[in-house]
Amino acid sequence: MGKEIEKKFIVSGDAYKSLAKGVLYRQGYIFFDKDKSVRVRVFNDKGYLTVKGTSTGISRLEYEYEIPVGEANEILEYLCEKPVIEKLRYKFQFEGFTWEVDEFLGENEGLVIAEIELPDENAVFKKPDWIGREVTGDPRYLNSNLVKNPYKNFKE
C-alpha cells in the first residue's frame, strides 16, 4: 500500500530556479472527485498512471505505475479532462528533505506551489525563506481542481 504524506505552500519569488533545472510535466485526469483521482502524467519521456485516495490530514493513499509513454500521451489527448495541466517542476534537497516546486503554465500561469513529502505526519522540517503560506488543506490548490477551476479565476 502506498501512502503520500505532504504539505503544500505558496512560493514567493523565484530563488528556487537556481536550485534545479525545471522539467516539463503534462498531466491529465481521467476521473476525479473530492475523494479520489486517477491521473496520467508524462515527463522525461516516461508515462505514469496514478490513483489517489481520500486525504486524511496531510496523508492519503497513492499508487503509481509506469506505463508506455505513447499510451500515456494518447490518454492525455483523448481520455483526460481538458485543459491538461502543464507545469515546470524543480526538484531539490533542502535540509534533508526533498522539495518540489511546480511553476504552472497555461490556464494556471502565475501559480507557483512548493511541496514537501514527509516520512510521517509529525516530521519537523525547515522551510526555505521563499516559502509562503501553507495551502495543504485548501482544495483549490489540488492539481485536479485546477483543471475545472484554473488559477486565473481565483479571487484571493
UniProtKB/Swiss-Prot annotation:
Phenotypic consequence of residue 62 to A: Strong loss of ATPase and inorganic triphosphatase activities
pH effect on activity, per entry: Optimum pH is between 8 and 8.5 for ATPase activity and between 9 and 9.5 for PPPase activity. Hydrolysis of ATP declines sharply as the pH is increased to 9.5 or decreased to below 7.0.
InterPro entries assigned to the protein according to its UniProt record, in alphabetical order: CYTH-like_dom_sf, CYTH_domain, NeuTTM/CthTTM-like
Reactions the enzyme catalyzes: triphosphate + H2O = phosphate + diphosphate; ATP + H2O = ADP + phosphate + H(+)
EC number: 3.6.1.25
SUPFAM superfamilies on file: CYTH-like phosphatases
Pfam families: CYTH (PF01928)
Domain CYTH: 2-148
UniProt KW Nucleotide-binding keyword: yes
Mutation effect (residue 8 to A): 16-fold increase in ATPase activity and strong loss of inorganic triphosphatase activity
Outcome of mutating residue 6 to A: Strong loss of ATPase and inorganic triphosphatase activities
Keyword ATP-binding attributed: yes
Consequence the record notes for mutating residue 115 to A: Partial loss of ATPase activity and inorganic triphosphatase activities
Keywords annotated in UniProt: ATP-binding, Hydrolase, Nucleotide-binding
Enzyme class: hydrolase
Catalytic residues (positions): 29
Stated consequence of mutating residue 117 to A: Strong loss of ATPase activity and inorganic triphosphatase activities
Assembly: Homodimer.
Known function: Involved in the hydrolysis of the beta-gamma-phosphoanhydride linkage of triphosphate-containing substrates (inorganic or nucleoside-linked). Catalyzes vigorously the hydrolysis of inorganic triphosphate (PPPi), however it can also catalyze the hydrolysis of ATP to ADP and phosphate. It can use ribonucleotides such as GTP, CTP, or UTP and deoxynucleotides such as dATP, dGTP, dCTP, and dTTP.
Annotated protein name in UniProt: Inorganic triphosphatase
Organism: Acetivibrio thermocellus (strain ATCC 27405 / DSM 1237 / JCM 9322 / NBRC 103400 / NCIMB 10682 / NRRL B-4536 / VPI 7372)
